[in-house]
Regions:
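Periplasmic-binding protein-like
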Residues: 33, 110-114, 209-256, 261-278, 281-285
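Bacterial N-terminal signal peptides
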Residues: 9-19
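A ligand-binding cleft/hinge motif common to bilobed small-molecule-binding domains
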Residues: 74-78, 91-101, 164-169, 195-230, ...
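A local structural motif
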Residues: 56-70, 148-153, 168-184, 191-193
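Short helix-initiation/N-cap motifs at beta->coil->alpha
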Residues: 52, 67-78, 139-142, 176-191, ...
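A conserved helix-loop-strand patch within extracytoplasmic ligand-binding domains
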Residues: 93, 100, 104-154, 159
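Extracytoplasmic small-molecule ligand-binding "clamshell" domains
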Residues: 24-92, 100, 268
Length: 285
């Protein structure tokens, strides 16, 4: 009886080892495919962008077989927690609020936010300091913005740090209009259906370059505070399924793998190279 039991346990251990190794080598990474130049789609429907190329670089360093899948932004975190995929690379800023439900790798790129208007807007002359880090305080600048945005309709993508900032009260009571994608924000800004928009600065410059529309960045660039501390890979918290379970251990190992790969990609200059290619400047951290 003991011998049979040992054989059965050995079989289970062997099967678990095979399954775990196969599972660990296959990583599904979600991106939105609608936030250029971070991530978008080519005319033939292929996922492209800074994060798509970076994901492939990181997977090569990790030795994992990766599949990049498309996911709507507003369902990004819930689907990760439901194990629809293993990681998120979608221009997702590292914020304290998000860290309550998921974990992040170390940051791989800086993202600064900016307000944008169409040329000729009354807000085009808005002058403030060049850059604002909300973690260090910016009362004077926020007061200026509160006055400037009073009565204006500001467009943002739903579920973003930009929406959270506008609704925080830091710039008074603002008429916020939300959109499912950044593309929709850009189109309504160009059509005059909103007065001003808030998003990553590169999202506006990319749109202006590709569309030829006279989009103008105004006011300061924002970082810190509600805007987070850079962009990283979103991952499940190891404790979500128990740190001692196979799934929990796998999630914990994946975090280590991504951190190691990001450090290598940073040291090798690959992140800088891709950032310059897609953003026009070095946004690596």
């Amino acid at each position: 009886m003991m011998r049979i039991r040992k054989v059965i346990l050995s079989i289970f251990a062997f099967l678990f080892l095979i399954t775990s190794n196969a599972y660990a080598d296959k990583v599904r990474i979600a991106t939105e495919g609608a936030y250029p130049p971070w991530n978008s789609k080519s005319p033939d429907g292929k996922l492209i962008g800074f994060e798509v190329e970076l994901a492939n670089v990181l997977c090569g360093y990790m030795g994992h077989e990766c599949t990049i899948v498309e996911q709507d932004w507003d369902g990004m975190i819930p689907a990760l927690r439901m194990r629809k995929y293993d990681a998120i690379m979608a221009g997702m800023s590292i914020t304290d609020e998000r860290k309550k439900v998921i974990t992040f790798s170390q940051g791989y790129a800086d993202e600064v936010a900016s307000l944008a208007v169409m040329k000729g807007s009354s807000l085009e002359s808005l002058k403030t300091v060049e850059a604002v880090n909300l973690s260090k305080g910016a009362k004077k600048t926020l007061k200026t913005l509160t006055t400037a945005l009073a009565g204006k309709t500001v467009g943002v993508q739903v579920g973003t740090i930009h929406q959270n900032f506008l609704e925080s009260g830091d710039v008074g009571k603002v008429n916020v209009r939300t959109y499912k994608t950044q593309d929709e924000v850009n189109l309504d800004l160009a059509a005059g259906r909103i007065d001003v928009a808030l998003a990553a600065a590169v999202a506006f410059t990319d749109y202006a370059e590709k569309s030829g529309k006279p989009v103008v960045l105004v006011g300061p660039t924002f970082s810190g505070g509600a805007f987070g501390n850079g962009v990283g890979v979103g991952l499940r918290q190891e404790a979500q399924f128990g740190s001692s379970t196979a799934m929990g251990k796998r999630d914990g190992q994946l975090l280590k793998d991504f951190n190691k790969a990001i450090k290598k990609a940073s040291k090798d200059g690959k992140i800088s190279e891709l950032a310059i290619k897609w953003f026009g400047f070095d946004a690596s951290m």
